[in-house]
Swiss-Prot record:
PANTHER family for this protein: LARGE RIBOSOMAL SUBUNIT PROTEIN UL30M, MITOCHONDRIAL RIBOSOMAL PROTEIN L30
Name under which the protein is recorded: Large ribosomal subunit protein uL30
Quaternary structure and partners: Part of the 50S ribosomal subunit.
UniProt keyword annotation of Metal-binding present: no
Organism for this UniProt entry: Erythrobacter litoralis (strain HTCC2594)
Record bears the keyword Protein transport: no
Span of the signal peptide: none
Similarity field: Belongs to the universal ribosomal protein uL30 family.
InterPro entries with a match to the protein in the record: Ribo_uL30_ferredoxin-like_sf, Ribosomal_uL30_bac-type, Ribosomal_uL30_ferredoxin-like
GO cellular component, one term: cytosolic large ribosomal subunit
């Protein structure tokens, strides 16, 4: 299966708890951290919920 790289670009400070949990679920906990995950509909959905906090890196 294809991989996707995600970089945290925004701070979770002053964000709703649900958005913080999505970041933790994606494995992101520090600014500018990059993780590589399987490209699944679940991961794409999580990214779609917090586009202001993450960016997809090629």
């Amino acid at each position: 299966m294809a991989k996707i790289k995600i970089k945290q670009t925004g701070s979770p400070i002053r964000r709703p708890e649900s958005q913080k949990k999505i970041l933790v679920g994606l494995g992101l906990n520090k600014m500018h951290k990059v993780v590589e995950l399987e490209d699944t509909p679940e991961v794409r959905g999580a990214i779609a919920k917090i586009p202001h906090l993450v960016e997809v890196v090629d």
